[in-house]
């Protein structure tokens, strides 16, 4: 279980993963329990609502509305309070990590004035902030961020080689080992064959994979559109 290094005798229940024994770990335990309670109560209510709308098409809007209007605000409000109250210890770091999983970029920006130097000095916090900066750079309406790799012949290839040339470019991120990716290839092929003469370009970007496996999958799946390979591990 997780616990916070603190002066005193720290006890961790290996069955419940609950840390006790010091003031900081008691606060950590209470924070985790409160977050779990907010989620459990919210999702229990959603389960009841689902009984009224078992159809997936009817259910999805209900789920989204309740989560956005009830669960998420309650969760973020509590976590923000914990961050501000614990900006110089591990409880605040935990709350910040959990907050980052539910907030949007505007909410993260608004939080920056509330956290202190200690939290900002942590590598975990810096990595999270970097991720949100990347999200802002790649948000809808922003210029695309170029991607570089090589094509199947080993020549350098970039996303910018295809975007801005007067075509519609559909970027498909995939890997030879990704079963859901492979299952979608026939659908992409149908779309590509239907619209390729009307300005549609599909660019496959194969990631987290080995070149020989990518090449074999391209042949096996009859992928006739351009590919950009990123074989870095």
Show where each model-derived region lies:
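A non-transmembrane, solvent-exposed segment enriched in polar/low-complexity residues
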Residues: 1-74
């Amino acid at each position: 279980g997780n616990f916070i290094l603190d002066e005193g005798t720290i006890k961790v229940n290996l069955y419940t993963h609950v840390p006790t024994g010091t003031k900081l770990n008691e606060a950590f335990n209470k924070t985790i329990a409160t977050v779990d309670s907010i989620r459990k109560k919210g999702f229990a209510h959603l389960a009841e609502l689902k009984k009224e709308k078992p159809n997936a098409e009817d259910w999805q809007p209900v789920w989204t509305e309740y989560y956005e209007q009830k669960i998420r605000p309650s969760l973020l409000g509590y976590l923000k309070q914990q961050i501000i109250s614990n900006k110089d210890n591990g409880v605040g770091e935990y709350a910040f990590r959990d907050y980052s999983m539910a907030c949007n970029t505007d909410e993260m920006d608004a939080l920056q004035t509330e956290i202190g130097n200690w939290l900002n000095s942590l590598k975990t916090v810096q990595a999270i902030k970097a991720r949100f900066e990347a999200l802002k750079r790649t948000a809808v309406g922003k210029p695309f961020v170029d991607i570089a790799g090589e094509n199947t012949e080993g020549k350098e290839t970039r996303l910018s080689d295809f975007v801005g040339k007067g075509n519609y470019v559909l970027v498909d991120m995939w890997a030879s080992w990704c079963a859901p990716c492979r299952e979608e290839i026939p659908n992409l092929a149908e779309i590509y064959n239907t619209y390729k003469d009307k300005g549609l370009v599909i660019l496959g970007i194969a990631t987290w994979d080995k070149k020989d496996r990518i090449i074999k999958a391209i042949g096996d799946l009859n992928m006739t559109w351009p590919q950009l390979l990123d074989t870095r591990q």
